[in-house]
Regions:
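Amphipathic alpha-helical "coupling" segments that flank catalytic cores
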Residues: 1-4, 21, 28-757
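Intrinsically disordered, low-complexity proline-rich regions
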Residues: 7-10, 14, 22-27
Length: 757
């Protein structure tokens, strides 16, 4: 099979001409359900969630595009490893296309000097199937053009669906379903995630026979039963089943034990596992849900059948995470626990009921015990190589990136980046020592056999090996916590975050090094392209920093980073630009951050990010403070002051950096200066104390009235340049007193609403 990038290809029309439709009157005069099944070879479990979602969303868009009428909640999409199914409830039997105006050639081109239609106009009408009587002249800013008035039409739904001559909505739907990898399987050049082996399309009880898949080997349709066949049974022995109606389809699936609805299938599997676990006094281990095994198994089977088994209790001496990884990765079986401890039992989910359950159980148990024996061997081999500091010496052989050196070099960078963070957090000498040790050992477990076998256990294995090497508990915990945030066990609740200060620091510097390293190589996330998970790294920095709520000095971190690869040989100007891009990217993550209530609006974040933001946490505190003031008159007053000073300064050539009080001659400007001079320290002190709400209220109360009087009675842009510059300097002083410390309130949308103060 040939594999390529994702492309679409329209399905071929049988015979190359418009098909004759076998219309059944009983379903043509009233709304009926549409059923469309795409039968395939087994789809990868990782593809299914996206394909199901796409099927529903794109079907809704295509129905609207082709002017079909149905309820907004009428479109349902389902999927199993062997079928994708679209159901549209109560689809109108008639497709009504409204009248359309289609622009044609300009009037000057459409008619000659004698007023007769030119070949350009006649050709346009021929292409649209229209006549001269269906045209009119329309004038617009682009001139006069001839428009074809396409009349409203009504077409039976069954004549449109699947008909290539009328748009072929169902064929388009298949072509629009994308997957990470697609393939061709015959001469039709149709591309899909896996070969399509049959199509079933019914409107009520009427088959839609206008299209057939470009498949010659599967024969999903026949001349005697066009569009009515589905396939049921085991993958090795699928049998064709004739379907008389939409309701008959679901009855056939039910008789075959197929649970089509993926949500119901997931629930049934979870209930079955829980039921069998309860029989041995246990429950399903929550990690089996949070780490994705339940979702994966849901998309691996369509006839789920549970089977309970057990393994040698000797392997319970392995760490919990190792046992769970072995069971999930190799056998995809569910672990059980009681009172927080794993039991030597499991539940496997089979595809259909086996003929010899006892034999299948023995095979699964034998393979699982062998896998666990391997894991125990890895554990013992790695312990023979401890302490962890000895493992860390081998990191020079583990590549981080071909242009960024090894993991040993990354460990050196982590220690350098930890210095400004330790200073900003005011860590004690003991804490600094723990952080340096954690940076040294952070990646050491990457050379272990266990992590090579189970990459998802990096950090977890390092924690155990550090502890077994006699390292302090804080270092061991930090090695695991460097990879957080992570989903919460059980799949519910917020992300799991570092619990320790050293772990939080290591998590931040590790992600900052990764982010800055790839940005330095010009590798920046774009659209949905983010192969190195840099978005997640940046978002993780924000989440961890907010949770620990200590200063994150971006400029100091960058100064520590810029002396190392890949920036060491970079020109200072280019390096500064790279630092700015990295920090701007970090700050932009604040728009997607899970803020506490009240959630800041985008304009509130805009306002703060328009001001200096060296400390990430300080910027976030300012955002929260401003959001809490929403609706307060004091905020509107402060915003108005910033807006008016900004407007007068915009485009003005300010050449005088400071105000000369001796040249302030008018009473309103003297008054405004006195307010500024006597209160600037108060505002600055409140901002320095991070009392941003109080600073904002004070700023608005102080300057709103005096500034209003100033603009009413004093002209800034006067012919006398020295006077003009002095007044502009006064506006600049008032403006920057707030904007250089807190936010540019002119970004707030409340000013656009022209609220009366």
């Amino acid at each position: 099979m040939k594999k390529k990038g994702v492309q679409g290809s329209r399905l071929k029309v049988q015979g190359g001409r418009q098909p004759s439709l076998n219309l059944e009157p009983r379903t043509l005069n009233r709304a009926a359900d549409l059923l469309f099944e795409i039968g395939t070879e087994e789809l990868p479990a990782a593809y299914l969630p996206s394909l199901i979602e796409q099927l529903g969303l794109k079907a809704k868009a295509l129905l609207a595009q082709h002017h079909f009428t149905c309820r907004s909640d009428a479109v349902e999409a389902f999927g199993t490893p062997r079928r994708l199914v679209l159901v549209v409830r109560g689809l109108d039997p008639v497709r009504r296309q409204p009248s359309q105006q289609i622009r044609g050639p300009a009037k000057a081109v459409a008619y000659d000097k004698a007023g007769k239609p030119t070949p350009a106009l006649l050709g346009f009408l021929r292409s649209r199937g229209g006549t001269l009587k269906q045209t009119k002249i329309v004038s617009s800013e682009k001139g006069e053009h001839v428009y074809f008035i396409k009349p409203a039409t009504e077409t039976r739904t069954v004549e449109v669906l699947g008909n290539p001559l009328l748009g072929d909505p169902l064929g388009q739907l298949i072509a629009q379903l994308h997957a990470p990898k697609t393939m061709r399987w015959d001469e039709s050049n149709t591309r899909f995630a896996r070969p399509i082996r049959w199509l079933l399309a019914l409107y009520g009880s009427t088959p839609l026979v206008g299209m057939r898949p470009g498949i010659t080997s599967a024969g999903g349709q026949t001349r005697s039963q066009p569009g009515r066949l589905t396939r049921l049974g085991r993958p090795q022995g699928l049998r064709e089943v004739r379907v008389a109606s939409v309701s008959g389809y679901f009855q056939a699936l039910q008789r075959a034990g197929i649970i089509l609805d993926q949500r119901q299938r997931r629930s049934r599997i979870e209930q079955a596992v829980s039921r069998l676990a309860a029989r041995v006094g246990g429950r399903i281990s929550p990690e089996m849900v949070s780490h994705g095994l339940l979702d994966e198994v849901t998309h691996l089977v369509e006839v789920p059948v549970p089977l309970a088994g057990g393994f040698d209790a000797t392997y319970l001496t392995l760490p919990r995470e190792v046992l769970l990884a072995s069971m999930a990765k190799h056998q995809r079986v569910f672990a059980m626990e009681a009172q927080g401890k794993l039991l030597p039992n499991f539940v496997a989910i089979l595809e259909g009921k086996p003929k010899r359950p006892a034999g299948v159980k023995r095979v699964i148990e034998r393979i699982l015990n062998a896998r666990l024996a391997d894991s125990l061997l890895f554990w013992k081999e790695d312990h023979a190589r401890l302490p962890l500091t000895r493992m860390a010496e081998s990191l020079s052989g583990v590549s981080f990136h071909e242009k960024l050196g090894s993991m040993a070099e990354k460990s050196v960078r982590l220690r350098a980046l930890a210095e400004p963070l330790a200073e900003a957090w005011k860590l004690t000498d003991e804490e600094c020592g723990l952080l340096r040790k954690a940076c040294q050992l952070a990646k050491a477990d990457l050379v272990s056999t266990m992590v090579k076998e189970f990459p998802t256990l990096q950090g977890v294995v390092g924690k155990y090996y550090a502890s077994d090497s006699g390292e302090p508990a804080a270092v061991a915990e930090a090695i695991e916590e460097q990879y957080l945030p992570a989903p919460h066990p059980g799949g519910a609740g917020p992300s799991r975050l570092p619990r320790t200060l050293i772990g939080s620091a290591l998590a931040i510097v590790d992600k900052y090094d990764t982010l800055s390293s790839y940005f330095g190589l010009g590798i920046v996330p774009s659209g949905d392209q983010d192969p190195f998970a840099l978005r997640r790294a940046a978002q993780g920095i924000v989440e961890v920093a907010w949770a620990v709520h200590r200063a994150l000095p971006l400029d100091q971190c960058w100064r520590a980073r810029v002396s190392m690869e890949p920036f060491r040989a970079t020109a200072p100007k280019d390096a500064a630009g790279a630092g700015h891009r990295i920090h701007r990217y970090l700050l932009e993550r604040l728009y997607a951050f899970a803020w506490p209530s009240p959630v800041p609006t985008a304009d509130c974040i805009d306002a703060v990010l328009a001001s200096p933001c060296d400390d990430l946490i300080d910027a976030m505190d300012r955002i929260v403070s401003l959001q809490r003031l929403t609706g307060h008159p004091g905020l509107r007053k402060a915003a108005k002051v910033i807006e008016r000073t900004r407007n007068i300064l915009k485009g003005a050539p300010l050449r005088q950096p400071q105000v000369d009080p001796a040249r302030l001659t008018e009473p309103p400007e003297r008054k405004l200066w006195d307010v500024y001079a006597s209160n600037r320290e108060r505002v600055a002190c409140l901002a320095a104390e991070r009392s941003y709400g109080d600073a904002t209220m004070l700023f608005g109360e102080l300057f709103f009235e005096p500034l209003h009087e100033f603009f009413d009675r004093v002209l800034v842009n006067v012919p006398d340049e020295s006077l003009q510059q002095n007044r502009l300097a006064l506006m600049q002083a008032i403006h920057t007193l707030y904007t250089e410390r807190i936010a540019d309130l002119s970004k707030l949308t409340l000013l656009q609403r022209e609220e009366i103060l």
